[in-house]
Amino acid sequence: MKITENYMEKVYAGWLGKIVGIRLGAPIEGWTYQRIRDVFGEVWSYPVDYKNFAADDDSNGPLFFIRALEDCEDLNNFSSKDVANALLNYAPYEHGFFWWGGYGVSTEHTAYLNLRNGIPAPRSGSIEQNGATMAEQIGGQIFIDSWGLVSPGNPEQAAKLAEQAAGVTHGGNGVYGGIYVACCISLAFEEKSIRDILEKALQYIPDDCEYARVVKAVMKFHDEHPENWRDCFDYIFENFGYDKYPGTCHIIPNAAVMILAMLYGHEDFSDTINICNMCGWDTDCNVGNVGTIMGVFAGIDGIDYDKWVKPINDFLACSNVVPSLNAVDIPFGASYFAKMAYALAGEEIPEKWNTILNERMDSCHFEYPTSTHAIRSCSPGDCHIRNTDEQAYTGERSLKLTAVTASGEESFFYKQTYYSSEDFDDSRYDPFFAPLVYPGQTVHLSVMPLPGEEMATTAQIYVKNGATGEIIRGEKVKGDGEWHALSMKIPGGQTGHISEVGVILCGVAKGFAMGDVSAYIDDLYFDGNPDYRLEFGRMQPDSWHVTHQEVPQFAKLKGHSYLDGQYLSLSCADFAEMYTGHHLWNNYRVTAGFKTCNRYGAFCEYSSAGGHA
């Protein structure tokens, strides 16, 4: 089946819907229906505001397990072993990423240790290995979205991929749930009715399995009692509640409320995810899956921008072991899924998207409607950021920036390129970060500053050293209503880290004046060779809480790491690994000073590294 013209917009809407659902459900995860009703009455918007929403297992899994498609040796013989390798390659050892509740308690933890100790997939997640209770918990479906997103209108492919993926950690109904959700997402690209999606996805799981039974039972109840979703929840609670199934978070009760929400939500994105959230239980997982299905089905236009999208601002924090992949934007994930979808379909990427998907996936291109690529602002007055098709340097869209300011005042619009604990309210799933851009590299930005009536606008490219606070300024252009392709090489050899890249807008008038300064920006990206130093003696630990202490700019797979004077120290009882830098670097050189001590085992101290490509 040929990938349709609207696929790119729908894959973005689906991934965006997933992130919206996770954020909506996370603050009340594990709450019962009654507790939510007693505390909130009804929940029709985000219960909590965040500086930035921290990492979450429900987004970590889909974004990193799908990398098995790119990393595998033979796409034609793709199997659960490839997904198992992705799990081992990208998940830290017993911290971050997902819930490490203990062997025999957490399904994913159990499967991970099985793999680490030589039990291969799919045996690693099977009922035969771990028992039905462990194998049929909810994780089989919560990490599965990406396999549907790479299979638009192709549920057969979605089912095959989801079976391989879910089987790494789950078995039985845990796998059937993964297949069902992936097929619903795949079908949502083409189908015109949610009911048709729910019915057709049943074709891909056994008709007599418990998962199929609960789906059909909830649909039957809805047919007979279509008026009130709360009546349906009472039915689910009595017949498919948590007391009916073993384990900490069984898949069946949670599947039931997902079906309820999609039937009683009347094909409206907001109503559907809110109803799902008010049902309680594993809210971020359930609303996340429903958000993906409904996002694909409704498209960008069906997702309320001010209510759901604007608070997220396209930002996504993650917690895999590759630190430069932990501060991404939602367009990056959508573009990665799209690249894999075209590879699986054997189709050429459309010309409009070719450069983005093959060369500049992590750029700010603004081609997805409503996308901001997490551009932020800092200004004395009000600022407005809006995706638009009014202008574009390349493609069809750009980002319009407006600040209300006085003559001579500067307004900063920027991509934050490094994050730390101070940027978050909590430490959920223990994220850690490396910078996205480095000294020695070149920043590119296209800008069109607008003339204005009372004040002319100037635009100047800049970067900020997050350690020193220094603002490094580049070329400045005047507001003439024309596009200017600016570039700026960041001085090499610096210590610290680059925390912001962007544009400074300033209003210029003959005397004092107040008014708007505006500009369009497009195609913000970085290239060139890094040339920088890490001086550990100048660093302070990034302290999230007592059990989450990070060395700045590093990720850790396993081991004990800490700053010790001018050294980074890493020790272990068996093995330890840490990583820094960017995942796209190759052919580079690092110089460092080492001290080793192996009297009582392995110990390494690593000092003052400098690297360049």
Q: Which residues fall in each region the model found?
A:
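Short proline/glycine- and polar residue-rich coil/turn motifs
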Residues: 55, 476-484, 493
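Extracytoplasmic
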Residues: 475-482, 510-512, 560-561, 573, ...
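Low-complexity, Ser/Thr/Pro/Gly-rich disordered linker/stalk regions
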Residues: 375, 379-382, 527-588
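Trp-centered recognition loops
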Residues: 440, 446, 478-487, 586-588, ...
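Structured, active/binding-site neighborhoods that engage oxygen-rich ligands
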Residues: 1-472, 496-499, 506-507, 514-532, ...
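Secretory/extracellular carbohydrate-interaction modules
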Residues: 570-613
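Short structured motifs
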Residues: 427-431, 470-474, 487, 574-579
